[in-house]
Amino acid sequence: DGYTRISESDMLLQPDPSTFQILPWRGDQGQSSRMFCDVLTPDGRPAPADPRHVLRRVLDRAADRGFTCFTHPEIEFYLLQSDQPGPDGEPVPVDRAGYFDNVPGSDAADFRRDAVSLLEGMGISVEFSHHENGPGQNEIDLRAADALTTADNVMTFRTVVKEVAAAQGTYATFMPKPFSEHPGSGMHTHISLFEGDSNAFYDPADEFRLSVTGRRFIAGLLRHSVEISAVTHQFVNSYKRLWGGGEAPSYVSWGHNNRSALVRVPLYLSLIHISE
């Protein structure tokens, strides 16, 4: 759904062998595997709206100009007691913990340990994991990888998180704003652009350590923020997250430490990158 008009709905799926992966859960039910597929039109051409094709096409254009793009996502989600609401009609989180809470033996700590172990076992490197601000809210950050690998890893990540939650008798949701009174969940994404071995965003002589390429990259993100939002914010609930604090972007602007800005540039000197 959403790829074409109804008169063009027949499509082909071409498995990408490089994404073959044995799924390590539910081993008592027999092993299963998965591969990501590229979407093709009936005549074998890449479907114009296939997300992997769209990303690959942009990365190829960047490569033709000598650039390589790396991304590093921080993925937030809530752990709930079940997929059913509580007596008051609200979802019920698994705990009432707060930011960076790490109580040994807690449901959230055990969950993160098991999820990270499973991800690492599948070849997906994890950089950090911790409890977030909301009750039952957690974050797991994946290590930087090329943009297409990251995109595939995020899709695998979502399945892993839901599988681990189900195995532990809980329910994981990536809903942007499941609670009106608690912070929403997002996926802050760090973007780095390299030209060979050099950070294309970094200029030590600039006031903000930003190169011309970095400034133009930010300008493009801000200029096309409305169009980008049509892809990244597909639901009414998505926009409920954007106002009311909670470190969610509220303004089409850029800055450094102001988390209400759409784009931030962390001041890590030569490690400067763009964070959305």
Specify the residue positions occupied by each region the protein language model found:
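Glycine-rich, acidic/polar active-site loops that bind/position phosphate-bearing ligands
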Residues: 1-271, 275
